[in-house]
């Protein structure tokens, strides 16, 4: 889909701050509010804008720490559908946050969230590994997030260590 300059500008504004209201977007883009609304409605209808979401730092919420894992998956593609069929089966699991087709040693990269490492292990052994097309998996646990989707989680400004000088 070919976009106009203003449509692209509005997408860039929303990509940076999905909470921006119509008036703010109109001022930033230099167009009337009703035109912004028309453009956004069109982009939503065409599924260019898929969703608006918040980015949560779950480590700061008691009882919601959880575990995130990236799983590299080797699969045997099926004739006529390639990797799409197995990717769809994988992304339908509730635990799965993202699925990517990759170049390199592994075919798919799967990001999942669980309450514990045991939950992730059960997902891999009971659900993922048992799929017909899956040949092998390698699981990597996320130990700490520094930056995600362009947003920095920790700046290091609150370093509480004591300064030691000679």
From Swiss-Prot:
- Residue ranges of DNA binding: 22-41
Keywords from UniProt, A to Z, are:
DNA-binding, Transcription, Transcription regulation
Note the InterPro entries from the entry: AsnC-type_HTH_dom (IPR000485), Dimeric_a/b-barrel (IPR011008), HTH-Siroheme_Decarb (IPR050684), Tscrpt_reg_AsnC-like (IPR019888), Tscrpt_reg_AsnC/Lrp_C (IPR019887), WH-like_DNA-bd_sf (IPR036388), WH_DNA-bd_sf (IPR036390)
**Which part of the chain is the HTH asnC-type domain?**
3-65
Keyword match Repeat = no
One Pfam family matching this protein: AsnC_trans_reg
Top-rank taxon: Bacteria
Note whether Iron-sulfur occurs among the keywords: no
SUPFAM superfamilies in the record: Dimeric alpha+beta barrel, Winged helix' DNA-binding domain
* A GO MF term: sequence-specific DNA binding
Q: What is this protein called?
A: Uncharacterized HTH-type transcriptional regulator YugG
